[in-house]
């Protein structure tokens, strides 16, 4: 996205969100002004996707939209103006993966929801290893982010009653992965670091939102360090 389009797009996003929501940001004040990294967040609603544009004044955010939305004119327009991509989430979309890696290596920011789908309950569900694969291949750090208040049901219910939303976005600490592992141990190591990402997100969430990671030993370790 060029700088002018980014400024206009971000202005609109921020204006709309401020119109309907009180947004609390925690931990975003020390983010680097340049350099590639992956934001890994929980996925609780459609409004999640707007938060990076509210928070980050960076024109190199990498937007991806599920291929199933390509039939809608709004999403085609959105992908075009943001220089985004449609991606097949159910199969290995090699072209989209390669382009994402290229942009990450060039210093872009990629937001991914490791769970792969919206959690209907708002609680964490079991994640997939996509974030770890991309971080390994691109050689970039991961920033865990926890969101609350963006749940689709909550958004609809409050807006129907003309009540403002209360959205909270909390960033944790960057962490980098060790060198990529190959061979027999690869799957187990990817699972280990996927759990690491999710436990770091869980540590930023209220206890009732930690879902399947609530009793994870690594989460207990992280909470004891806070």
What is the predicted function of each stretch?
Residues 103-131:
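Catalytic-site beta-strand/loop segments enriched in glycine and acidic/polar residues
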Residues 1-11, 15, 24-33, 102-105, ...:
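Membrane-interfacial terminal anchoring regions of lipid-handling membrane enzymes
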Residues 31, 123-188, 192, 218-225:
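A cross-family acyltransferase "interaction/gating" segment
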Residues 18-26, 151-153:
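Short gly/ser/thr-rich secondary-structure transition/capping motifs
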Residues 3-6, 10, 18, 32-91:
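Catalytic core of membrane glycerolipid acyltransferases/transacylases, capturing the structured
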Residues 55, 78, 102, 133-137:
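Hydrophobic/aromatic ligand-binding patch that stacks against planar heteroaromatic rings
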Residues 85-107:
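Helix-adjacent hinge/juxtasegments
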